[in-house]
Amino acid sequence: FSGGALVTVIVNSSFMKFFTDVIGISPALYGLVFLIFSIWNGINDPIIGYWADKQPYRTGKGKYLPLIRWAITVIGIPVIMLLFTSPGWNDVVTVIFLLIFMVIYEGGQTLLNVSFMAFTVNTFLSTKERTQVTMIGSYLNMLPAFLGGMIPIWFFTGDFSRMQLIGVFTGAILLGLFLTWIGQFSVREDETFYHALQVTSGL
C-alpha cells in the first residue's frame, strides 16, 4: 500500500502551496482549514476503526478487503476534485469546498489505514511476523514518499501553468491509487483468521 504514501505526501507537502500560490487564498485561511482537518483526523480514527472492526466477514469477499477497495475510491475522488478549484471563486466558497473534500479524503485515508492495520494484526498473529511486515512496508513506502516530496520542488519552482500543474498532480495521484489498487491483491483473508480475533478493537 505504498501508493497511499504518495498521495499523503502530495496532500501534505503540495496542497498548501497550490492553494496559496495558484488558487490564491491566504496562508491563514489554508491554515485554518488544515487545523480543522487535523482535529477531524484525531476524532475520526477511533470512530472509523471501531466501525471497520465491527464489519462481518463476508464469504467470498472478506472482512477488510471490501473496505480497502472502497477506501481507494473515497481517497481519489476528493483529492482530484480539489485540484480543479477555481481561482475565480471567492474565499468563502474555496474554504468550504476545500474543507468538505479534505474531510472526505481523510475519512478514506483513515479507512484504508485502519483496515490494513487490523488485517495485519489478525493475519500475522506473532509479534515477530507483524514486525517483519511493518518493516517491509516502511521500506516500500520510501520511494513513493520521496517522489511525492520531490514533485513540488520540480514543478512549483518552474514556469508551469495551472492546468499543467493539475495534470502533473492528477497523474501522480492516479499513480498512487493504482499502486494501492495493485497492493490490495496481496491481501488474502481467511475466515479462520477471525476465529482467533486478537486486538483490533480501537485501532
Set out the residue ranges of the language-model regions:
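Membrane-embedded alpha-helical bundles of multi-pass transporters/translocases
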Residues: 1-203
